[in-house]
Amino acid sequence: MAAVLSPRPCDSNPATPGTQSIKDDIEENSSDGSQAPKRRRMGSGDSSRSCDTSTHELGPTYFPAENLTEYKWPPDDTGEYYMLQEQVSEYLGVTSFKRKYPEMERRDLSHKEKLYLREQNVITETQCTLGLTALRSDEVIDLMIKEYPAKHAEYSVILQERERQRITKEYNVSTLSVQMQQQNPQKVEASKVPEYIKKAAKKAAEFNSNFNRERMEERRAYFDLQTHIIQVPQGKYKILPPERTKTGPFPVALIPGQFQEYYKRYSPNELRYLPLNTALFEPPLDPELPALDSDGDSDDGDDGKEDGKKNKGSSDSSSGNTSDGDSQDSGIHSKVKSKDRPGAQGKDGTPRSIQHKSVPGYKPKVIPNAICGICQKGKEANKRGKPEALIHCSQCQNSGHPSCLDMSVDLVAKIKMYPWQCMECKTCTVCQQPHHEEEMMFCDKCDRGFHTFCVGMDSIPMGCWVCDLCSKDISTPQKKGQTKTPKKAK
């Protein structure tokens, strides 16, 4: 709070001895050897002049905080709050405010702004003709907080009082309007009361629905001021039945070897890959990830271990093939031909899935009203205009004419003996994986797909290539070999 000025010496009796002695001492000390001024008795006129002199000696005139005005310009929603530099400098007691605080943002008042302040009784008509300067209100408040805390405290009290008066005025106006309504109540017809109730309920329902929709769409997350955490609604999730989440007496093992009820249940298909020492299948590849090339592994493993384990491998494969050959003919799907690696060179020891085997009595898929994917025609006519039956993929809905796919009659007959796959669905017969399409080659007799590294080849061979399954069915080379050996023996 600003200090209240003490009574000036001129307000006391001029004839007071203390005052007169001070006057005499000043006159005696001011003499510098010249003729001393004559003493005069202080009259009424002298007291007024002495009062003005003492006022200037004590300091600048007091500017009350009530006169410090903060206004908004422009008055609309886009306006900002300002203060007049002349009022601020007079309130803070700063003579040259601009030179002392040159870094503050300031601007000159426009003519419209001066007229607005004149209407608000902030400035006088004389001040309208002068050049006035506006300062940003927030910068002035920050300056008072840092360098003039007493002035800021005094101004804060005034602001609180103004806010209290504004709230009281608004409350009085609202109370007066309510009283007027109570004195003059509206007359409602009794027959229209149910209609008004329905309208009110409808309006309330619309408000609640709009409020909930706005809260879910625009205010789903909120900032917690106490924990400084952004709270987000929890997502919906499915709840398991109680019997699935009920814990037993041994939920988890606390020491090694202790029994626990939580363990993984493997399906029969998964057990074929476990345990490692008696696994029937190789570890499967993840369809979502690219398979690793096994060219180098197959080449190095075949070259280094072929000589050392040739006899043992041949005996194992021969014994396994004799038993597995019978199981293939009988149609038992749970048996697998061999445990050899995909890169091992053994025609009889390559594991193959049942979908690539020629199953006796297999019937190909029948799709009515199928259309060829190449010529976009049905079985009534192919690209040459002749009727031709279509072949269908066993995995998808693709179909095609054999002539459009450049397939021979023998190849079509072979395809109808097993679940044939189109180019988009083609998988390797050995590893059952669709990866490494650049290393995939196809048999010219049955159109089955094989990876080069799965059959022990470095690259795709040139010319015609026949897979192991089709080479078993070809009996001509075997007869020639049998006829040659007796001739040599003779």
Curated annotation (Swiss-Prot):
Region (SAY) residue spans: 83-292
Zinc finger regions, PHD-type: 371-428, 430-473
Compartments in which it is found: Nucleus
Feature: compositional bias, Low complexity: 284-293, 314-331
A single BP term in Gene Ontology: nervous system development
SMART domains membership: PHD
Region annotation Disordered: where it falls in the sequence: 1-61, 284-362
SUPFAM superfamilies xrefs: FYVE/PHD zinc finger (SSF57903)
Main function: Involved in transcription activity regulation by chromatin remodeling in the context of the neural progenitors-specific chromatin remodeling complex (npBAF complex). May play a role in the proliferation of neural progenitors.
Quaternary state and interactors: Component of neural progenitors-specific chromatin remodeling complex (npBAF complex), a subfamily of ATP-dependent SWI/SNF chromatin remodeling complexes.
Designated name of the protein: PHD finger protein 10
Species this protein is from: Danio rerio
